[in-house]
Structures are given as structure tokens and as C-alpha cells.
Amino acid sequence: MSAWARRGDDGRWIFSLYITPGAGQNVVAGERDGRLHIKLAARAADNQANAALLKFLAAQLAVAKTRLELLKGDTSRQKLVAAPGEAAPERLLENAS
């Protein structure tokens, strides 16, 4: 697996992400400095981008949004997100631009 996805001690996936808010659409834009680069249409105001990120990841990984957790980076472009162990990280790259 890529450097941006690793297993946590509890068996969950930990994703290291770089987020660009205010993009034209929600899309995985490849890798950037060891992180998965995701562009989001939502603005980085009033927690809109974080909410959009979790919704986008849930759809891409086919898991419930409530099973994702923002671990670090609440106000940063660099984020750590935990996903359940049965999530398939490679699904995030299937539609990368």
C-alpha cells in the first residue's frame, strides 16, 4: 500500500491526506508529498470542507460516514482520517485524475 495509507494499532486504516478546498468538484488528485491529494468543492469555512471530506471518503470507500474519524488537522490542509479495517484504500485511487 502507498505511504498515505497504513494500518493503525486498532486495525483501522489511517489515511494521510492533503486537502485543497474550493475546487470545482470533489476528486482524488493523486499523491502529493506522501499524502493522498483530494480536491473538494466545499470552502474551508464553518467546517464545510471537513464535512465534505468525510462524506466524499464514505462514498468512495462504501462505508458509513459515521465510521470515519478526523484524527488530526481540523483547521489544516494536512489531515489524518481513520477508516474501518474493512475499507479498501485502493478504491480511492480508482477514479484519481
Where are these regions (language model features)?
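Contiguous, often N-terminal, cationic amphipathic patches that form binding interfaces
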Residues: M1-L54, V63-K65, E69-D74, K79-S97
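C-terminal catalytic core of tyrosine-transesterase DNA break-rejoin enzymes
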Residues: Q60
